[in-house]
Amino acid sequence: MRIGQGIDVHRFSDDPARVLFIGLVEIPGALGLAGHSDADVATHALCDALLGAANLGDLGRHFPDTDASIAGVSSKSLLEQTLKLVSDAGYRCTSGDITIIAEAPKLASFMPAMSEALSAVVGTVISLKATTTEGLGAIGRAEGIGASAVVLIEEK
């Protein structure tokens, strides 16, 4: 059994039409995050944790923001491709946990849908929770959103 940890942070977009996705779920009425893909911090942190656990580097190594062919890609696609890399390395995920760090928007009502969506793709329970930074730092000033993820993987 191996453990992996991932962290991701994105600032809010200047584009008022940008959609916010967290944990593969669209958060209606909220300003989206800036990024090369859909900027889903929870899913990106999960991907980084999976890649780290399998000793496969990080998300940027496999899906660089300089690759125009993946501009605007959905994080579901990144997660599916990440799981394939992990599987090809001989592992499968047995557990995952994500903490979303944000002052706004409030996400409690979206947590069950996020867990369901991520769990369906990964094939095991992915739990989620949210916290704030009590107004401290860039996230505390509501300049963006962050996420931290931890996973357990085992040999297939």
Regions found by a protein language model. Give the residues of each.
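Acidic-glycine-rich active-site phosphate/pyrophosphate-binding loop
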Residues: H10-E26, E116-V125
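A short glycine/serine-rich beta->alpha loop
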Residues: I27-S37, D65-I70, G135-I139
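Glycine- and Gly-Pro-enriched alpha-helical subdomains that act as flexible
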Residues: A49-R92, E103
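Active-site His/Glu-centered metal-binding helix of metallohydrolases
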Residues: A42, L46, L50
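C-terminal edge-of-domain segments
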Residues: I139-K156
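Short, conserved loop-to-beta-strand elements that form functional interface hotspots
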Residues: S95-G140
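N-terminal, polar/charged subdomain of small-to-medium soluble alpha/beta proteins
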Residues: V9-F12, I22-G23, G29, A42, ...
